[in-house]
Amino acid sequence: APEDAARYMLLCREQQFTLEELRASAAGVPLSDGDECTGNAEGEPVLCRAGRSSFWLTWDGRMIPCGMMASPGTPVLEQGFSAAWRSVRTEVEAIRLPAACAGCALRRHCNLCAASCFAETGDYDRKPDYICSLTHTLCRITREKYGTED
């Protein structure tokens, strides 16, 4: 359930971040945990390294942008490495994340990515309700625990 996952994520963050950083997060400042998959452009592109500066090779010889994505995939042995890399990069450039998420006040706190969208909805541009609920819950419990009374 999103509530349990959010509580676990907060426990992990408590090991990784200082009290001041957690309090700032409760006040709306995104934590910098090295996650490059955040942004705020409408229908934003893939912002992580998937298919932009990294790839995975599958057991059957396909090049895919990320270990969490089954497609797009290009057969390396049939097309050659350079052509497969160009194909994966071109296909990843065409992927757009949900426009509905771009205007969300919590977008900079969200772990939305193309793989999570596709895994939950079957599309890259449809909002994954689980990730959305998880983000809202994590922000709420962080505010409850680390927010300051004004």
Where on the chain are the PLM-derived regions?
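Iron-sulfur (Fe-S) cluster-binding modules
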Residues: 142-150
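Cysteine-cluster motifs in flexible loop/terminal segments that predominantly coordinate metals
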Residues: 95-142
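Short, small/polar residue-rich loop motifs at catalytic or cofactor-binding pockets
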Residues: 48-52
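Short, acidic, Ser/Thr-enriched surface-loop or helix-capping motifs
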Residues: 57-58
